[in-house]
A protein has these predicted regions:
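Conserved GHKL (Bergerat-fold) ATPase module
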Residues: 1-170
Length: 170
């Protein structure tokens, strides 16, 4: 009972800090992150409350809640199956070429380089069906978010008739 009470009070206080002093909360986020992630991974009741003040950091240094970030990237980072793809990098400097290629395509990238981030990613994907995290260096930039693209036919109908026997004879 005592641990549940303490957990609830901590979550309420963090929510209050987030709501009333967001810039100060963001400034302290890098120090708070591991404790909040650990709490979310180990205590379901804390996780329910913490989802409102858990922040994600983009490579530009801006902080977002999960809802804010997903709403921001939903239009450009949804694949052909309807999954919202959240791109992330664990080493911005070391994987700069991958980051720049993704940014050139108009994609937004999260910086997830903490000790518990891989566990948090699995947790978040298990709780949200239509969300997938993809590391920015896991594939070529064109395959990170698979869009349904149709190849335009560049042959005229006359050229198609000429080519048809060639392919049918194979």
């Amino acid at each position: 009972k005592i641990s549940g009470y303490i957990t609830r009070k901590v979550a309420d206080r963090l929510q209050e800090l987030f709501s009333t002093m967001r810039t100060d909360y963001e400034a302290k986020w890098d120090d708070l992150k591991i404790f909040i992630q650990y709490g979310m991974l180990t205590d379901e009741k804390f996780a329910e409350k913490a989802q409102n003040f858990m922040l994600w950091k983009s490579i530009e240094g801006k902080y977002y809640t999960s809802t804010e970030y997903i709403d921001k990237v939903r239009e450009t980072q949804t694949d052909k199956d309807g999954f919202t793809i959240l791109l992330y990098v664990d080493d911005v400097v070391g994987k700069d070429s991958f980051v720049e290629a993704a940014k050139a395509k108009g994609y937004d990238i999260l910086e997830l380089n903490g000790q518990l981030d891989s566990h948090y990613i699995q947790y978040f994907e298990s709780k949200n069906e239509k969300i997938r995290f993809v590391r920015v260096d896991s594939d070529i930039v064109d395959n990170l978010i698979r869009k349904e693209e149709r190849m335009a036919m560049s042959l005229s109908s006359e050229q198609q008739e000429i080519m048809r026997p060639v392919f049918e004879s194979q």
